[in-house]
């Protein structure tokens, strides 16, 4: 058995091996003859959490901790809880010999921890562990070459990633491993000029052995191109990295979705509720149980009545606070529990219910065989009878709605058809909106020899008394625009409000064009029915009525006098912005920052309402948001039927628009449309708002856009946008749909920003010089008709303000 002196010698040897630069701490000289000594080695990096724990026995009377022979005391970083010591944010001074002495009747047992804290340099890119070794091998290879060699890149595969986007306060490391004979020199340039340590706060470190530069705690002023210049007498080579520093945006605590989760357990069980909290500022976490007093769950102040079950103490870690332990639960414990987390920015909370049931019997009563067999027979018989009834009902329904056969010539319409219209709703909808409804009754034959629906009036629609409006009280006016299958004209409706029968209301009337097809009629009816089911909201275009009897179908909707949001913003650009505009039509309206945030807030409210009705828009953009006379934002075209399964998104169509630059990657590549894909489009719409109607991804061809999106690139921050709003855009553009915010969260955040924004905050709308720099030749005419515009359209938009087709210095994009 090893003696005490042998153990001391072994501990000193371990410490000398771990830290050659530090004097090896020695063990205490005086130890009880009965003492048992153990030594454990422990290595950690700078900034890590040190955790040292003693092994305890049942008969331990007391525990003492020492470091390098001195009693260990608690500090703001050091916490001692009996048999455990925790040191937060470890530094090199925390290295040493820690001793845990447990006193027992049989003697003292001492455990030594030889701790070594070493420095660690994080890097933007993952360097191989053998950087030092490879550098040595390169130099040996260079020196062994008899002939001179010009500089060359030793590991070009490690230099492929040129754009680096990192959060502020991170450490950045760029490497340019090179070789040559004689050994070349290394210099670093920033923005094409020599980069010296005094050019940035905190300087930088150059490690010539690994051909690298290291910058600690980067700040936004560190953005820019960094060039490594490698040269010797026989040549020179260089490589440029682009650094982008993203500022952190403070936010209230974020709680992981689905936690804590509802639980159902037998009485007497143990329950753990888990709550994952993410927060930059230090969060304060509490666990609450909702209670009732005199049958009420709320106090006189209207706030819920709660009992604090767990709160953070002086020595409690966040990890401990994220779990609530309930032991041996009873029926009285069955109630609602809440995890409440707050920081200096705000408060977040998630709740879960605990259900306690009777304990499951260990010996359940087993059915006798005859009874069990009888139940199976009855259930099987009932199932077969139900299947037969369902089959008969479906067969009769098909016969009732069956279309009459056409002749071989499709140009002759035999009869008016019943259109089974399928609603556009999200996949999780369980409402009746997902069912097919027959909206058109058969009528007499049409004598038309045209494949177009010239006899529109011969299609009889069932009258809906809630929405039917008399034709003789509707006056049609000038055209407002044309769509794929119909047109919109201005109109005046007399007595639209039944309480004011003589009042004239300006409206917009949707109708079919003269060359409309049967599918066009089906689409218009589908849009009308969708608007009926969705209902009314201030921030969507609402259905006001319809003329379905004794004539062509007219769908009456709200009129927005100021046009779509894209043109509304462009018309309010000041003359100083670089785009072709007509000075005669420049509006005198001044837009404040609060006006732009209000636009975004109203659109978010409209989309929140549509999402609550299980409606997926699929084409949210500034061109599909209309503006009323009172500058109220109203979302349009949410009821359109869009065929998303037969569109080639990589090609232009003759009359169709492909909104690829607004589409989420999962919609673009996999054709998966959800509320979260609408959130991506909302992020692009935010970018449109704060560029006053700019075209997304300016100057980027669509084929290149597909590649950039897959690589994680995103658009730059607009010049007049705050960091908080830009971070909101970036959240909307998260590659993982489930990580994007919901419209409810967007409404809450924008509501807060609107409330905190002053009305007098007018924008400095002069575009910065470096916001767009020439990247593609400018071949504009007086009107925009680019095939590379943000929406693919065969026909140009007349009199449309044009933005220069410029590209940012790095492609106008950032990588997430």
From Swiss-Prot:
Autophosphorylated. Binding of FGF family members together with heparan sulfate proteoglycan or heparin promotes receptor dimerization and autophosphorylation on tyrosine residues. Autophosphorylation occurs in trans between the two FGFR molecules present in the dimer and proceeds in a highly ordered manner. Phosphotyrosine residues provide docking sites for interacting proteins and so are crucial for FGFR1 function and its regulation. Ubiquitinated. FGFR1 is rapidly ubiquitinated after autophosphorylation, leading to internalization and degradation. It is found in: Cell membrane; Nucleus; Cytoplasm, Cytosol; Cytoplasmic vesicle. The modification Phosphotyrosine is found at residues 459, 579, 581, 649-650, 726, 762. Residues 474-763 form the Protein kinase domain. Its EC number is 2.7.10.1. Residues 1-23 form the signal peptide. Glycans are attached at residues 76, 116, 238, 262, 294, 315, 328. Residues 396-816 are cytoplasmic. Keywords: ATP-binding, Cell membrane, Cytoplasm, Cytoplasmic vesicle, Disulfide bond, Glycoprotein, Immunoglobulin domain, Kinase, Membrane, Nucleotide-binding, Nucleus, Phosphoprotein, Receptor, Repeat, Signal, Transferase, Transmembrane, Transmembrane helix, Tyrosine-protein kinase, Ubl conjugation. Present in an inactive conformation in the absence of bound ligand. Ligand binding leads to dimerization and activation by sequential autophosphorylation on tyrosine residues. This is Fibroblast growth factor receptor 1. It comes from Pleurodeles waltl. The lineage of its organism: Eukaryota, Metazoa, Chordata, Craniata, Vertebrata.
